[in-house]
Amino acid sequence: MERFEGKVAVVTGAGAGIGKACALAIAREGGRVVVADLDGSAAIACTAQIAAEAGNALAMAMDIADAQAVAALFETAERHFGGVDLLVNNASAMHLTPRDRAILDLDLAVWDQTMATNLRGTLLCCRQAIPRMIARGGGAIVNMSSCQGLSGDTAQTSYAVSKAAMNMLSASLATQYGHAQIRCNAVAPGLIMTERLLAKLDKCMQRHLSRHQLLPRVGHPEDVAALVAFLLSDDASFITGQVVCIDGGMLAHMPTYADGGNSCAGRTAGDTAETARC
């Protein structure tokens, strides 16, 4: 029997990247998936791929910062599939990160919008999912955090704080609703080469980032999706309230770089001074 046979999952931010990989992974193991994304066309494309693989999915265009839209999302999931068993809170205000700066340079509108999506939106989804999970005898939630929620950075203040708060939200949910057979964990990815990230990085920067991974490769959305699927499944039935890093060892080593600059420490044989600066 497939791990998610008979289960209904809601995945937010599922039109691309990690969210899409999670939706596909759940569907491939028998789950019925509600694919939610701000970009409706991306959500439809994801459901089309699931359907092409003989899966069952429903696309919804919505903004998780909108409480009414979130309520409609879960009402639709219940009406269409009969309930909700699994939730992946992956949607994030990534479009704001170029303007998400150090504290004194930070536009408070960026802070407010980031918190509205990353934190409040996650809370809204959890509040809609929990009663429906209780009605079905329990469920599992994975909140998509980040390694940036576990260590300081020279910029992206709002994003990092929102992810740190998400970690505590996950622990609080696990504590408050474990008696109802609801598990909640956070997943903290490191450098994951999504299509969106690859489009922003030139070859030189890709080389620089790859050089500072402990493993001889970068992460991919499918790596994160495999972890998420495990945490949602009965294979992880005694795991709850945890923040699980999937970062290729990014946070396991020293030194870190307080100025955000480049290092020659990872220079490999054959690198010139110029390529080391890349």
From Swiss-Prot:
List of residues binding substrate: S146
Residues binding NADP(+), per UniProt: 10-34
Protein's UniProt keywords contain Ion transport: no
Keyword tags: Oxidoreductase, Plasmid
Enzyme class: oxidoreductase
Active site: Y159 (proton acceptor)
SMART domains linked: PKS_KR
InterPro entries hit by this protein: NAD(P)-bd_dom_sf, Sc_DH/Rdtase_CS, SDR_fam
GO MF terms held by the record: oxidoreductase activity
Alphabetized CDD domains for the sequence: SDR_c12 (cd08944)
Similarity comment: family membership: Belongs to the short-chain dehydrogenases/reductases (SDR) family.
NCBIfam families recorded: PRK07231.1 (NF005559)
Protein name: Uncharacterized short-chain type dehydrogenase/reductase y4lA
Organism field: Sinorhizobium fredii (strain NBRC 101917 / NGR234)
